[in-house]
């Protein structure tokens, strides 16, 4: 199992002064650039520590929000591709459907892959609804635009015999010829995220690494949809390396201290949805079917524990988050057991996206959290034998 450390790089000093929305409309006068600089340096120091500890790195981007200062993920990738030496660098993700110029995306990511000497994992995502005001995109066209941008980027990265032209619905180019060419052949590994069984099946058909974020014990349903898509396309079961899950992680030698850390990290969940209602679900962003499920209360923010009990992940405590597989929290032995139980429930999982820092967790607490995890949990996760993929797939197909 690989483990990637992730933080939203939040500007948390303003979390208690938001006037009802931390996203889109929060005035940037509430951001002190000197404080922001200190926070950025702190977050990069923690990523450098991960490189030393054998933990890989995950970055993302969001816009116009105090929940995430990383508004351009390639800036973080550029910094980390130079100051780290061993860690894989995962971008999860890059909202390519929002971008005006996928050629620039192909050039940026190709350059990052070269500077890092082949350590880039590139995750392409649709993006959350709060991003639409910043990009001014039509939400009804977003997925079509996403897949055209995806197809163009892959073609640009894999064409090595001169220029080509592109005439699509959204993008038009002449004489495309990306320099430098990517380090990894034919291109860096592709990841994506979803909370939809339909989209999970599509990702399975493409063979991409699929990540789910905060889906708890509902993750197995999404993994099985992926397995069906993958088996239908490739005629074999997908390996555990095709599956990833983002979970909050708080570990300490003392159980009480671990719970304190877990509660601080869970501040990410409590603040991420503080946004004015009009920005939460713009018309056309999701399908009519998914909107109907939301109205019936069948989709997040509700999560589900292993026994099927529903919880609101944005307004609950540490115990419920542990029971739902959203938070792995406790002593090293407890955290290891929780992660393995979750992996077994899902039929295998090769990539843990570990939110080992969030919210008000201090630098000192974060360093201890990451260091203890790397010494007493990570080696056992790497040594753990995944469930037999073919046996899991046969059970899904039965």
Q: Which residues make up each language-model segment?
A:
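Conserved, mostly hydrophobic/aromatic
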Residues: 3, 61, 80, 112, ...
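An alpha-helical appendage that flanks or caps ligand/catalytic pockets
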Residues: 4-31, 52, 143-179, 219-346, ...
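Glycine-rich, proline-tolerant flexible connector loops at the mouths of alpha/beta enzymes
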Residues: 58-76, 96, 130-133, 214-216, ...
């Amino acid at each position: 199992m690989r483990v990637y450390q992730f933080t939203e790089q939040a500007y948390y000093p303003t979390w208690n002064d938001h006037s009802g929305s931390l996203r889109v409309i929060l005035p940037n006068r509430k951001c002190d650039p000197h404080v922001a600089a200190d926070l950025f340096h702190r977050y990069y120091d923690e990523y450098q520590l991960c490189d030393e500890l054998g933990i890989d790195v995950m970055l993302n981007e969001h816009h116009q929000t105090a929940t995430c200062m990383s508004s351009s993920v390639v800036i973080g990738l550029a910094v980390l591709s130079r100051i780290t030496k061993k860690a894989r660098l995962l971008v999860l993700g890059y909202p390519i459907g929002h971008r005006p110029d996928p050629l620039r995306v192909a050039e940026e990511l190709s350059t990052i892959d070269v500077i890092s000497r082949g350590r880039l994992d590139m995750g392409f995502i649709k993006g959350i609804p709060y991003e639409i005001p910043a990009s001014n995109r039509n939400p009804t066209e977003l997925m079509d635009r996403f897949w055209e941008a995806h197809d163009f980027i892959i073609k640009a990265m894999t064409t090595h015999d001169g220029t080509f032209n592109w005439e699509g619905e959204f993008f038009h180019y002449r004489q495309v010829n990306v320099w430098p060419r990517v380090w990894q052949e034919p291109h860096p590994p592709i990841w994506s995220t979803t909370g939809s069984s339909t989209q999970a099946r599509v990702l399975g058909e493409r063979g991409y690494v699929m990540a789910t974020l905060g889906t708890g014990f509902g993750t197995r349903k999404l993994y099985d949809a992926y397995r069906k898509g993958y088996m239908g396309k490739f005629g074999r079961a997908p390996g555990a390396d095709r599956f990833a899950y983002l979970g909050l992680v708080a570990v300490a030698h003392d159980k009480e201290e671990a719970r304190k850390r877990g509660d601080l990290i869970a501040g990410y969940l409590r603040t991420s949805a503080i946004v004015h209602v009009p920005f939460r679900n713009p018309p056309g962003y999701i399908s009519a079917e998914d909107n109907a499920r939301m109205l019936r209360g069948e989709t997040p923010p509700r999560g589900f524990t292993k026994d099927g009990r529903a919880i609101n992940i944005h307004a609950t405590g540490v115990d419920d988050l542990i029971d739902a597989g959203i938070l792995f929290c406790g002593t090293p032995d407890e955290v290891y057991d929780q992660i393995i139980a979750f992996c077994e429930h899902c039929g295998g999982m090769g990539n843990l996206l570990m939110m080992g820092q969030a919210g008000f967790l201090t630098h000192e607490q974060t360093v201890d959290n990451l260091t203890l995890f790397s010494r007493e949990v990570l080696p056992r996760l790497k040594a753990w034998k995944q469930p037999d993929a073919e046996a899991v797939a046969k059970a899904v197909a039965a």
